[in-house]
Swiss-Prot record:
This is D-ribose pyranase. Belongs to the RbsD / FucU family. RbsD subfamily. The gene is rbsD. Substrate binds at D28, H102, Y124, S125, N126. Homodecamer. It comes from the Bacteria. GO terms for biological process: D-ribose catabolic process. The lineage of its organism: Bacteria, Thermotogati, Thermotogota, Thermotogae, Thermotogales. InterPro entries: D-ribose_pyranase, RbsD-like_sf, RbsD_FucU. It comes from Thermotoga petrophila (strain ATCC BAA-488 / DSM 13995 / JCM 10881 / RKU-1). Disulfide bonds: none annotated.
Length: 135
């Protein structure tokens, strides 16, 4: 049995298969995941698990060069935005942050290698992690 890192086998596999510039979408419980997309639904209750705790574990294994957020998060959910940016910055202070309109975010997410649905229940609690390289 695996002891450390991502213990969910499907998420672990998705991260292991990521290449440079591949994307992984970590989304809230209401986000529309496209039919046929690879997804892991972690929701056990409203708010559980939260976006930040899921992202924190994934960042232990995934090299991230950029994150994409909905620009609506700036007005509707600045607290989560700030906590998320600080969390990502702890792992890599050079991570680029891109804000796009929510409708554009949904379009971009369709090209993600996978989706991880969290129990996040705050508006626009979604992030796309863009994979970097380790060399």
């Amino acid at each position: 049995m695996k002891r450390v890192g991502i213990l969910n086998s499907t998420i672990s596999e998705m991260v292991a298969n990521m290449g440079h510039t591949d994307m992984l979408a970590i989304v809230d419980m209401g986000f529309p995941i496209p039919d046929g997309a690879k997804k892991v639904d972690l929701v056990v209750d409203k708010g559980k698990p939260g976006l930040l705790e899921v992202v924190e574990v994934i960042l232990k294994e995934l090299e991230v060069e950029k994150i994409i957020l909905a620009e609506e998060m700036n007005e509707k959910n600045p607290e989560t935005r700030d906590l998320l940016i600080n969390l990502v910055g702890k792992n890599n202070s050079n991570v680029k942050i891109e804000f796009v309109p929510h409708e554009e975010f949904k379009k971009i997410s369709r090209t993600s290698k996978g989706f991880v649905r969290t129990g996040a229940d705050r508006p626009y609690s979604n992030v796309i992690l863009v994979s970097g390289v380790i060399f």
